[in-house]
Amino acid sequence: MKTALLLGIHCHQPIDNFNYVFDDAIEKSYKPFFEILAKFPEFKISVHFSGSLLEYIRKNDKKLFCLMQELSDQIEFFTGGFYEPVLASIPSIDRVAQITKLNRYIKKHFNQTPKGLWLTERVWDNSIIMDLKSCGIEYVIVDDYHLKASGAKLDNLNGYFTTEESGEQMGVFPINQELRYAIPFYSLEKTQDILHKFSQEDGKNAAIIFDDGEKFGIWPKTYETVYEKKWLEKFIIQTLADETIEVQTFEEFYTKNKPIALTYLPTVSYFEMGEWSLNSSDGFELENIIQAHPELSKFLRGSTWKNFFTKYQESNWIQKRYIELSKKQYDSKFYKEALYKAQCNDVLWHGVFGGIYLPNLRDNAYRYIIECEKQLDQGHDIIDIDMNGYNEYKFKNGQLLSIVSSKQGGQIFELDLLKHNFNLQNTLTRYEEVYHHKIELEDSETVKDTKTLEEDDDIATIHDNTLSVDKEISLDYDWYLKKSAIDHIVSNEITLEEFAKNNFREYGDFANQAFEVLKCSKKKLHLQRDGGIYDVQNLQTTLCKNYHFKKNKIEVDIDIDNASSKYNYLHEWNLHFASLQEVSFNGVTLDTQEQYSMIEIISDSLIIKDKYLDKTFVFTSKNLSKIFITSLNSISQSEKGVDITNQGVSIGFLYNLSSNFTTQIDFDLKKREDSIV
């Protein structure tokens, strides 16, 4: 009775993540893993590293890179997109280019021609098969859940399957979920018992595990278990000594064995990803159904990975921006490299890790989007970027690139400082998440009982994290996108706190509804909405919003007809700053330690000084009643627990309305010493 153990690790860090994150991962995970592997040349393993991570290691830890080269005889290197895109989310031409780039890198540095591909986040879509075949790929890694979702028998997921698209075949290896949750979290005895379940007389059964290398040292409490308590070394010794287990690479097993059956996979990722991509109400309902009826889990699934583009509009915007730029196929190596880097997947979704909630990841994506834009001509363009059936209007003048959405309240969706490769509109709307309900139900004394786990030499995975907070938080959500030049009709008695928490009453229908485009020229955009003010008596009201995009300046003219002095007009901007503690508002700074830090100013101007960017942003207007300023913070989960993350600053310019109201808001970009750029 024998089992073929196919063990693989996937290692990746987001493009341009902080150096200390890379270095910590190298010291706590990658380096000790390969140092232990070097002690056992007969222990074979399959490995996937994203290209950007390999490059970082090559440049910053030559010793580790050389060790990986020395071990190449016992390692099978898997390929993928060089900068770790979700392959189904990028155009075919970029898919082939990114895989080819990593193939060549592996051949050059490790003298292997990859036959296997690590499927980023195991996001399967049949549309990728033709491109994979053109790159020489013979098999990919998915989850057993992919096969379960296609109707495969649960007791038959112990080898590889084959699938096809237009007659092009592809091998499919399903990762065993039980092993994925066991290694390296269960005791050695429990793990070995699971492996023995796969034993078969002819030795053709495979125990398949291919998962994050960061589980070995980076995930909470794993460094102590895996290396200090020598779980990994003991596991290798125990496995090699077990005559019923034969350690193989995926290529060896693929070459020696026939597929189990033909299968056709649905468009799906691993089960948890389907849960995460649901909107909060559906996600909460699915969670309750699974808890009540675990026997139905085979027939239940969440949404597809691409649903993140509808769940988080900021994710959709980034993805559609690089789709737009890819279509141009500008013939420049620098342009294409920037484009491929922008396609890194981490920023586009959210599960256990920060993802879309991490401003630095969004900054990195926009850095490369803007690098591409800088190589294109100045001027204006009209295009449906986000593919919602409504055009966006792009203006590139001087050092500013501005994009306005006609559908979403005529808001400014993107505001790029071209010289700095920085998007001031890289804000994030406050979304409701399923796990927010868990935070609400817990108190500061709630601590997960891990004694039983410790007694069994098991450790909890990040999926078992307790979401507790050490101080009271306020869960507040936004019903409109937090971008800029947003039009509100509000009460005369609106307060700063109501604005901050977005629980003020909205009387108008202008903030998130479509505007008609009356005129668009090289530097001007005229918008109009025939809407209303909705109260005891409804008023048909027209709001005209005219943009003038000058060199390093934006003028916004507002005309509101048939309004009422019973209400105030609130004009809202939301701006993103890379280092909020280095930003002042008319000389006052926000407290970055508080969930809500608020400032109320009575002035006709607002001077924002950003020491980090070495820029000053000046808003001026007439007849202002007051200015509201508040931090825009999100509540999200990560591998460490609950994060309160600054996503920007909300600024509200408040005016007393009249029957025929007119005002102008000017936004000036200046150097920090206040001279015009």
Language-model-detected regions and their locations in the chain:
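Active-site and substrate-binding clefts of carbohydrate-active enzymes
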Residues: K2-K31, A38-F40, L157-T162, S166-M170, ...
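Loop-rich catalytic cores of soluble enzymes, especially ATP-dependent carboxylate-amine ligases
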Residues: E138-K204, F210-G217, E228-K229, V268, ...
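Short helix/loop capping segments that flank catalytic or ligand/cofactor-binding pockets
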Residues: A149-S150, Y181-P184, G217-W219, I403-S406, ...
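A contiguous, surface-exposed recognition patch within enzymatic or periplasmic domains that forms
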Residues: I439-N503, T589-T662
